[in-house]
């Protein structure tokens, strides 16, 4: 399936089809900010002859409540249980971006909130970043490596880097799984206390087992970078301090 998607992307890149999605509408619900994801999806629809609409709750539209069973007497005028079916009725496919709440690691790993929203949509559904996944970005990274002729069995280093604030786990989790699924020798380089959750590592190891790749982790920079074909730098918050920003800064 990944190979087919990349082949399609390459064909459209070489032989554009400006009317392929004529008359089609893509709805884009951004519960969280975006630059590249928002602009790339809109540009993609325009290049294929389709159109899109963007809803960012609280910016020109009502705030949207996501909590199940919430009493609607506070700031939000809409609930996702009504909002998503309505938005889906206006489009041919719906993309949703909704980050992790960052409070309960187990709930975020289970994608509890995102699965609820996905279940409310009766149209083709696109994950534009959830608590633990950013599949479209990972797919684009895979294509970029193919375009640059990075060996399928090459060494891929996912390295933690400093950021002033703790960032979500979605991108590192998606990137790790992508490289493992591609069959690469994947190394997660991170300081003590920043090991990715075992569920994330186990999923990547399972993908590597199928693809013929391997997944490891270390805190030793020299050994991790030796012979690397790709260095992917990304910050993520410490799972040990999940839901506690003050502990993270200490």
Kindly give the residue locations of the regions a language model identified:
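Positively charged, low-complexity intrinsically disordered leader regions
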Residues: 1-43
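Residue-level detector of anion-binding/catalytic polar loops
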Residues: 51-52, 58-59, 93, 124, ...
């Amino acid at each position: 399936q990944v190979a087919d998607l990349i082949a399609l992307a390459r064909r459209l890149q070489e032989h554009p089809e400006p009317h392929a999605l004529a008359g089609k509408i893509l709805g884009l619900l951004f519960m969280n900010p975006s630059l590249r994801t928002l602009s790339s999806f809109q540009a993609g629809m325009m290049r294929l002859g389709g159109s899109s609409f963007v809803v960012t709750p609280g910016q020109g539209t009502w705030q949207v409540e996501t909590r199940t069973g919430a009493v609607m007497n506070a700031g939000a005028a809409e609930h996702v249980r009504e909002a998503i079916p309505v938005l889906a009725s206006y489009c041919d496919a719906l993309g949703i971006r909704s980050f992790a709440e960052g409070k309960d690691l187990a709930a975020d790993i289970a994608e509890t909130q995102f699965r609820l929203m996905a279940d409310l949509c009766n149209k083709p559904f696109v994950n534009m970043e959830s608590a633990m996944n950013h599949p479209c970005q990972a797919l684009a990274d895979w294509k970029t490596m193919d375009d640059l002729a990075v060996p399928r069995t090459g060494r891929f280093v996912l390295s933690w880097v400093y950021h002033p604030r703790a960032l979500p786990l979605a991108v590192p989790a998606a990137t790790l799984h992508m490289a493992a699924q591609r069959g690469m020798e994947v190394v997660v380089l991170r300081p003590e206390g920043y090991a990715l959750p075992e569920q994330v590592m186990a999923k990547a190891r399972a993908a590597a087992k199928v693809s013929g790749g391997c997944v490891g982790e270390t805190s030793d920079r020299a050994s991790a970078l030796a012979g690397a074909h790709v260095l992917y730098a990304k910050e993520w918050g410490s799972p040990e301090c999940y839901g506690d920003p003050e502990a993270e800064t200490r």
